[in-house]
Design a protein with these regions (language model features):
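Fungal secretory targeting signals
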Residues: 1-25
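Mature, structured extracellular domains of secreted fungal proteins
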Residues: 20-181
Length: 181
């Protein structure tokens, strides 16, 4: 009886520990999405502010550096989502809602980067459009991996909605990549 009691005590402690770890991981994923939201907004604002002509190399490199930071954040967030495992219903809904909220900003940034291509091409450094193309490709890869991890861990009833968001966002990169290719 004493051994059985110890077993249940150990099992209870392990269960509580696991629940706390999963809770922390979900909190980390939510924090990652908040950081991604801030970085996407910063990137979109920098692209919007870049003029069609007469822009500066410093402003163009700021856009590049912001994109590079976003790629790093997306890669870290992908690792966090993967290590968290399947999300519960409430957390899955919260995460999906957060991603849906930044979708218009992502789409706006990708539309504007195409519109601003003449401004980047007019700068005295010839390789800038190629640098932007590389950033776009890397952003698409990182975004796709993050979205794939989210879909894989979404509750079953949210998978289709998550896939729709994933498809919309990753497909939005194609016209931008084509414009700079």
């Amino acid at each position: 009886m004493v051994q059985l009691s110890r077993f249940f005590t150990v099992l209870s402690v392990a269960t509580v520990s696991l629940a706390l770890i999963v809770g922390r991981d979900v909190a980390k994923v939510k924090a990652d999405i908040a950081t991604i939201t801030t970085q996407v907004t910063t990137l979109d604002n920098a692209i919007q502010a870049f003029p069609l002509s007469g822009g500066s190399l410093l402003n163009a490199l700021t856009i590049h550096n912001t994109a590079t930071g976003l790629i790093t954040t997306l890669n870290g967030a992908t690792t966090d989502v993967t290590s968290t495992g399947p999300l519960g219903e409430a957390d899955g809904r919260a995460v999906l809602t957060s991603v849906e909220a930044i979708q218009p900003v992502i789409l706006d940034a990708l539309t504007n980067i195409v519109v601003k291509k003449p401004g980047f091409a007019s700068l005295p450094i010839g390789g800038l459009p190629a640098l932007i193309l590389q950033d776009l490709k890397n952003l698409k890869t990182a975004t796709s991996a993050f979205a794939t991890a989210l879909v894989a861990n979404a509750p079953a009833d949210l998978v289709e909605e998550a896939k729709t968001v994933q498809t919309t966002i990753t497909n939005a990169f194609d016209p931008a990549i084509a414009a700079y290719s």
